[in-house]
Every structure is written in structure tokens, then in C-alpha cells.
């Protein structure tokens, strides 16, 4: 199966440099105040109501698990297919983001984030007129007001960044628009990428950073999920990396060295507060699978997970929240099903490469009509057991034949527990997802609850940003080796990248970093944007999607 390529998603919605109407630009969110809601005058005449209004803006941060009509964004890439859903399953499996239910990623995103931006603009425009809460001191009032203004600026910048990824540079609105006013004279010309990203988003993040909550305050339980100073620097690191990448560098003017500098700025300024989740057992051995799992599922409350930087705070979840992405043998609906393409990207547990050659998408090279890349015989890789003796992150991410999980072991042989006859939700790839699915929910007949907070940025990304940028500046070097080795070591992979003779050039290391970034952040909504900024979306999204069949005797064969 191939996925059709939508190289520039925003072209589907904005086909020219001018926009034609107020409704086209801003959707329906400029409708007048419903009669059953508080008016702006009521909200901004009371400090407590103003605070509630502001904190509600955090709800515009989205959770990525099953967010697109029960489907994940990575199901629209080469990393997975989706088995559960109606129109969206068909749309995503053929790469049609705009057809059927898959359209929600484009249409809903536009209105969703512009609503969030409007709330930010309302807060920023009117907070100075809100009277002080009589119960607060003047110092507290001024301190809180400063924090809320900075948070609104951060959130607005983040919302604009998410819109940029999908639509390119669009109108920058920093005022509260009047639905009865003349909008066409001001908001019909799109800014350049530099004006939109460098001059606005990056400047907003940099200038609001000092006024945000400091680390100590933002990472307490009472402030859980609030925007803190490290988040602004972390988001700048992500955006700078994008702007230095081939897709955007000529428009932005940002260099790889500048991107490296911002990643290093985070490490220097906040590195004592953050770290990879890296627990050891009683003997000092790394708990690779547990570390990788906990990096996402352990909450950041009270510093219990120092890897998480920026996240969406949520209540605990239950069986109903994860059912759509659990194996059918467990009573679930299949959902996100990893591809063999993803499985092929993982190294061996000893740090060696199972295949001889990798391309700029991070994937091994599939030659001609072969579904199996050329195997590196020194690695010990066996395609009859493609998950055996691999990077522990594979076992923490993918449920494969024989894996112990939930109430039993995975069995995807035809007609068996996880691939029963007549069940349309059975995996089309031979795999189910394990990452981001809290297994504690399955306890006591699925009556458990657990946190599954959506991580937007974690410390591993800052390290990977630094490694990628430094390789582009200097080629393979100590800074690159150090970042990659730390990320791989905490996952339980032995051997230093510096000792790999197959990674001795900038080009080879680039392909390796693309591979490492893909598997480290798989199903965290990175791949679909990374392949575009690397200018390799055509190669990544037009190739066949592979899976496996498991015969009655357990024999493995690949399939398209």
C-alpha cells in the first residue's frame, strides 16, 4: 500500500497569496456572543472570572492520541496504518488528509487555533482594565498579571506555529476583531515566512520568556501544566531547527549554527532541571523499556519526570480512552497499527545496524521490488524474527507476535486472538501499538485508571535538535556523539555511535540522525513535519507500506 503525497498541506486551503473573504479567513468563530454566555464586560470586570477565562485557553492545546476522528497523525505517514474508524481509516491509509473524516485535521485545526488566538488577544487587550481581587496583595496582583500576559503571548505564538505547519504563513492577528468591522483591508495579504516565524513567533517567545513562571513554580502540583520559562526556550529550539532545515532556510535566513546555539542555550540554562528518564535496576543496569515508557507516561508533577518540558495537562484516563488503540484480542478496536517500515528502522540491541544502507528519510533502502532491505550479516539480524534482539525501544513501542501484554500474549495468526475472522478492526500490518497505552488501565477487567498526558516537547528532543544541528555544522563530532549516545544508552542500547565506522561522514550521520529522531519520537506527531522540513516527503510518503503475515506455524512473511 502506498500513501498519496500531500507535500504542502496548506495549498489545499489557501491557494493564493490573497484571501477572499472574512469567512474564508476566520471561519465561524467571529460569531457574536451567545445569549447564554458571559459578556466580555462581565468577564473583564472581575479578576477571578478573568483568570478562569485565561486558564480555559489551555484547552486549545491538543492531545494527539486518536485526535483525528479516532486516528493519530502518524497514521498518515509511512510509520503506521489505522484499523479503526470509518471514513478516516480509508482516507488516511491512502494518504488523503482532506477526504472524509480526515478533513478534520485541516478544517477543524484552522478554526480551533484561531479561537484560541482570539482568547489570547482578548486577554492581552483587556487585562489592564480588570480590577484587583480584594483578597490579593498588590504585589501578587501585578505578579500574576505579568505571568498571565506572558502565558497568553506564548500560547498565541504556539497556536500560530501549529497553523504555520499546516497552512504556511497566514494573517497575524494581534487585536480583537470586530465581526461587523472591515477586515479585508488588513488581513488579505500573507506575510513571508521570515515575517511570520522569525520576526513574530520567535520574537514573541524570546521576549515573553522572563515573565513566565520560573521552573520551581511552574513544576509544582498547584501549577501543573502552566507555561514556564523553559517551555519558551524549548519551543524556540524546535522552531529554529525547522527554520534552519532545507525546506525553510532560504526564506528564514536561519543557519544551523543558530539552531544549535538555541538548543545549547536550553541545555546550559535549564539542563540542571531536566534530564532523560533513566532509571537503573539494583545492579546498575539500565531499564531500557521501562525508561522509554515512563518518559511519556510518568507525569511531570513535583519533578517525578524530569524529561517532560511542555505538555497538555489532563485528568486520568480509563478503558474508554484507550480502547480504540488496543488489540482486538483485548477487547479493543485495533486502531494505530505500526508498519514493518517502522520496525525496520530500529538498530540491534548491541547498537549495530541490521541493514547495510539507509536513506535521507531515515529508512533502510529497499532495492527494486524487494520488501527486505539488504541485511548486514555481522548484525545477526534474522528476518524470520524481525523483532528479536533489537533496540529496546521497539518492544516499548510495538506489540508483535508473542509479546506479553494485557491479559495474554499477542497472537496475530489468522483466526486467532488478535486477528479473528470477520473482525474489520484487526491489524492490517501484523502489529499493534504499545507506546502511549498505559497497561495499568487493563487491570481488574479494565477498571484501572492512569494518566496519559500528551507530551509536546521533552528533553530528548532538545538533545536531538542539538545533535542534528551540530552535525550539519561540523559533521560527526563529540557533541553529536554525546547527545546520541545518551539517548540510546537510556533505552538500553550498548555501544557508542563514535565507534560506528558506517557513520563517518556528515551525509551518513545525517541519515542516521533522521532515523534516530523518527524512532525516538514515533507517534508523537514529529514524522509528518520532519520529512517535509528535510525535503524528503516525496520519498517517505510515496513508498510502499509493509506489514507481516504470521502463518499458523509461526512463520513470518512480509506483505505490502
Kindly label every feature range from the protein language model.
Residues 1-34:
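Bacterial Sec-dependent N-terminal signal peptides
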Residues 22-23, 58, 83, 113-116, ...:
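Long, intrinsically disordered, low-complexity segments
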Residues 22-73, 388:
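Membrane-proximal, proline-rich intrinsically disordered regions
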Residues 46-51, 55-64, 86-167, 187-199, ...:
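Conserved, well-structured interaction surfaces
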Residues 156-157, 236-237, 451-494:
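Extended amphipathic alpha-helical segments enriched in small hydrophobics
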Residues 164-165, 171, 216, 239-251, ...:
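Short coil/turn linking the two alpha-helices of tandem helical-hairpin repeats
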Residues 305-419, 475-476:
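Glycine-rich, aromatic-lined ligand/substrate-binding cores of catalytic
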Amino acid at each position: 500500500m502506498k500513501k498519496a503525497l500531500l507535500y504542502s498541506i496548506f495549498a489545499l486551503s489557501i491557494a493564493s497569496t490573497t484571501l477572499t473573504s472574512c469567512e474564508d479567513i476566520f471561519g465561524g468563530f467571529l460569531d457574536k456572543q451567545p445569549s447564554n454566555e458571559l459578556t466580555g464586560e462581565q468577564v473583564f470586570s472581575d479578576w477571578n472570572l478573568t483568570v478562569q477565562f485565561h486558564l480555559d485557553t489551555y484547552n486549545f492545546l491538543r492531545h494527539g492520541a486518536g485526535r483525528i476522528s479516532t486516528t493519530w497523525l502518524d497514521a498518515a505517514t509511512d510509520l503506521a496504518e489505522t484499523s479503526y474508524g470509518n471514513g478516516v481509516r480509508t482516507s488516511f491509509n491512502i494518504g488523503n488528509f482532506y477526504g472524509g473524516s480526515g478533513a478534520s485535521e485541516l478544517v477543524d485545526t484552522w478554526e480551533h487555533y484561531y479561537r484560541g488566538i482570539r482568547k489570547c488577544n482578548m486577554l492581552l487587550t483587556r487585562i489592564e482594565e480588570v480590577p484587583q481581587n480584594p483578597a490579593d496583595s498588590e504585589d501578587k496582583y501585578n505578579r500574576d498579571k505579568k505571568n498571565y500576559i506572558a502565558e497568553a503571548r506564548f500560547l498565541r505564538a504556539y497556536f500560530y506555529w501549529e497553523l504555520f505547519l499546516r497552512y504556511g504563513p497566514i494573517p497575524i492577528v494581534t487585536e480583537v476583531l470586530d465581526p461587523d468591522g472591515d477586515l479585508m483591508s488588513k488581513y488579505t495579504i500573507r506575510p513571508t515566512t521570515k515575517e511570520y516565524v522569525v520576526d513574530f513567533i520567535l520574537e514573541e517567545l524570546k521576549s515573553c520568556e522572563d515573565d513566565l513562571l520560573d521552573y520551581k513554580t511552574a513544576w509544582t502540583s498547584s501549577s501543573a501544566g502552566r507555561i514556564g520559562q523553559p517551555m519558551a526556550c524549548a519551543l524556540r529550539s524546535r522552531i529554529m531547527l525547522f527554520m534552519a532545515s532545507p525546506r525553510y532556510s532560504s526564506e528564514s535566513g536561519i543557519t544551523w549554527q543558530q539552531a544549535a546555539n538555541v538548543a545549547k542555550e536550553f541545555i546550559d540554562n535549564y539542563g540542571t532541571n531536566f534530564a532523560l528518564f533513566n532509571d537503573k535496576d539494583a545492579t546498575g543496569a539500565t531499564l531500557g523499556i521501562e525508561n522509554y515508557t515512563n518518559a511519556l507516561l510518568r507525569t511531570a508533577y513535583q519533578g517525578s519526570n524530569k524529561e517532560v518540558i511542555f505538555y497538555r495537562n489532563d485528568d486520568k484516563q480509563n478503558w474508554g480512552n484507550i480502547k480504540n488503540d488496543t488489540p482486538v484480542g483485548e477487547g479493543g478496536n485495533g486502531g494505530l497499527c505500526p508498519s514493518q517500515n517502522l520496525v525496520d528502522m530500529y538498530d540491534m540491541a548491541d547498537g549495530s545496524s541490521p541493514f547495510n544502507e539507509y536513506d535521507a528519510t531515515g529508512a533502510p533502502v529497499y532495492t527494486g521490488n524487494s520488501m527486505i532491505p539488504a541485511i548486514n550479516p555481522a548484525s545477526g539480524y534474522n528476518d524470520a524474527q524481525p523483532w528479536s534482539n533489537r533496540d529496546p525501544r521497539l518492544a516499548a513501542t510495538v506489540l508483535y507476535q508473542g509479546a506479553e501484554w494485557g491479559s495474554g500474549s499477542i497472537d496475530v495468526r489468522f483466526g486467532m486472538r488478535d486477528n479473528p475472522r470477520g473482525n474489520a478492526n484487526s491489524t492490517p500490518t501484523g502489529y499493534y501499538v504499545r507506546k502511549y497505552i498505559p497497561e495499568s488501565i487493563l487491570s481488574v477487567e479494565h477498571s484501572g485508571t492512569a494518566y496519559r498526558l500528551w507530551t509536546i516537547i521533552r528533553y530528548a528532543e532538545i538533545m536531538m535538535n542539538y545533535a542534528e544541528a551540530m552535525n550539519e555544522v561540523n559533521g560527526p563530532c563529540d557533541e553529536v556523539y554525546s547527545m546520541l549516545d545518551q539517548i540510546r544508552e537510556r533505552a538500553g542500547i550498548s555501544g557508542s555511535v563514535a565507534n560506528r565506522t558506517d557513520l563517518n561522514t556528515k551525509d551518513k550521520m545525517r541519515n542516521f540522525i533522521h532515523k534516530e529522531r523518527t524512532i525516538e519520537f514515533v507517534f508523537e506527531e514529529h514524522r509528518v513535519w520532519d520529512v517535509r522540513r528535510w525535503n524528503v516527503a516525496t520519498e517517505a510518503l510515496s513508498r510502499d507500506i509493509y506489514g507481516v503475515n504470521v502463518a499458523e506455524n509461526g512463520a513470518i512473511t512480509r506483505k505490502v
